[in-house]
């Protein structure tokens, strides 16, 4: 679906969103839903989850939701948000950047240990190493690539000189736009040229970190015995039709 929660409900349950009953964002997954993780947990698999969940209402970030849906180790699961920097504390994980005492989407000072994509990958590798030789299922849900289009160095400037293609549909008039989208903010070609190199950087950072997971599995001798599914809850318009999201 075009939005997060219904897609996630469908991926986890194998049902159409309307039967979960998550038909829009910030709706709680029905307690009766049996996820693939719950099926595997019952079969003796070690299960875990890290990253964005978006199936427990409007809590934000809301770490480690009480309803686990089969993901036994959900310490690094958070319900909502596209956070850019995390840290471990004696009281558990938290969003590192604070503004007026509240978490926000800042990327300042993020590095290969604290940037969200890298931090979550470390949690995956830790779980993989802890369960070497055992059946396991771990799901990691990276917030990126997603707005805000920011990423840590060196990815933030890696594609600065790339020529960004501008979609023809960016210049659609209001009359050419469906009524439901006509009042939404529109982006210009100049905005696309600024934001897309950072988007490419987010994708490259993600790609490198997936490579780290594969390397860890290979080093442990687990790669050939592991099924890896790479998917997404939805895409990004990247300027098509004058929209980003």
Task: Give the positions of each predicted feature.
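Formylglycine-dependent sulfatase
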Residues: 1-245
